[in-house]
């Protein structure tokens, strides 16, 4: 939706063809960590991640201004606990206060070494709802309830897309189908679903947690309304979005191990989403094999984070400009 918004602002007529209800797949399921400094971020992705994080305050401001809706963007930062699989990185600041990590978050049971990252977090559901309002304000059309199944091509040039309900004609098509991008006929991209189960707890008190807390096996993302989002699994389960009660219980217990007061916290909701993975865990951003066809998919864990910069560089590419960030590592032809 960020790309649709950007293209419309640059004068294009935009139609979003959505397989289901807009914004109800990976974006709806995401935790909303804007983890540009995560030590697990591939180095090839770092320039995009850092650039997108810098764009976020203005991006959210524009969406709020266009929609009249509030988006919960928090800048309290992330407490990163040590992870044996990844060094903290140059952007991490060791927490050296005499009281350690509990100086920042007294509710944490953890007392060892930790690092503070200057990251933000956003409520993805509030963001998507506001973007849909902004899209309506910008007169972006949305055709929902029927997936694009085929790229229509004539003489090596895009003519539009076909769904079970209708054909939509357009000189430019962008495959933004996430985990379903590979199902887009001959114009598919090698994405696959990576299942993640999560839950939301009601904090026993509003000030229980201010920072995002990221540990090797669990993360906690506080919302301004008192919810705490707990995640997440990473499962190769195809397109299965069923929630397993035992898995949710394990996540809840891991959260309580970090913040004991969460042990008795009420569960508001549990859900599963499908991250759009790729073979090298990097997004696919670039031109397709025929004129007028582009791909912006496979953002894996970073779809919410990368929304602003994806809109910028793909708009530049579609308009025939040189993208401000080199996209060679993300091309469709690398597979």
Regions found by a protein language model. Give the residues of each.
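Active-site substrate-recognition segment that forms the wall
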Residues: 2-10, 32-34, 38, 69-74, ...
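Short loop/edge segments at beta-strand edges and connector loops
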Residues: 18, 97, 144-146, 269-271
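C-terminal catalytic lobe of FAD-dependent flavoproteins
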Residues: 124, 259-335
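A short, glycine/Asx- and small/polar-enriched loop/turn
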Residues: 104-111, 152-159, 276-281, 288-291
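Dinucleotide-binding Rossmann-like beta1-alpha1 core, especially the glycine-rich loop
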Residues: 32-104, 110-111, 254-256
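Glycine-rich FAD pyrophosphate-binding loop
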Residues: 8-29
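Helical element adjacent to the flavin cofactor pocket in flavoenzyme catalytic cores
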Residues: 114-172, 176
């Amino acid at each position: 939706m960020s790309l649709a918004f950007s293209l419309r602002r640059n004068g294009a007529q935009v139609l979003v063809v959505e397989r289901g209800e807009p914004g109800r797949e990976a974006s709806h399921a995401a935790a909303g960590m804007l983890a540009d400094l995560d030590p697990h971020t591939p180095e090839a992705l770092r320039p995009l991640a850092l650039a997108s994080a810098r764009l976020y305050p203005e991006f959210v401001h524009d969406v709020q201004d266009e929609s009249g809706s509030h988006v919960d963007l928090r800048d309290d930062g992330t407490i990163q606990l040590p992870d044996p699989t990844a060094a903290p990185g140059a952007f991490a600041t060791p927490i050296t206060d005499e009281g350690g990590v509990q100086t920042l978050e007294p509710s944490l049971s953890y007392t060892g070494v930790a690092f503070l990252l200057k990251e933000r977090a956003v409520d993805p559901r509030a963001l998507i709802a506001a973007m849909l309002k902004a899209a309506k304000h910008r007169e972006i059309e949305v055709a929902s309830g029927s997936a694009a199944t085929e790229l229509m091509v004539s003489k090596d040039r895009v003519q539009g897309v076909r769904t079970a309900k209708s054909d939509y004609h357009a000189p430019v098509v962008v495959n933004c189908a996430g985990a379903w991008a590979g199902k887009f006929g001959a114009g598919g991209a090698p994405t696959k679903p990576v299942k993640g189960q999560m839950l939301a707890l009601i904090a026993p008190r509003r000030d229980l947690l201010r920072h995002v807390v990221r540990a090797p096996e669990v993360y906690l993302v506080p919302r301004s309304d008192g919810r705490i989002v707990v995640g997440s699994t990473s499962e190769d389960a195809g397109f299965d979005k069923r929630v397993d009660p035992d898995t949710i219980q394990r996540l809840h217990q891991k959260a309580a191990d970090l913040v004991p007061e969460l042990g008795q916290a009420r569960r508001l909701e549990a859900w599963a989403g499908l991250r759009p993975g790729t073979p090298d865990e990097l997004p696919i951003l670039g031109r397709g094999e025929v004129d007028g066809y582009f791909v912006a998919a496979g953002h894996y864990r970073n779809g919410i984070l990368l929304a602003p910069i994806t809109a910028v560089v793909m708009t530049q590419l579609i308009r025939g400009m040189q993208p401000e960030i080199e996209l060679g590592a993300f091309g469709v032809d690398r597979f």
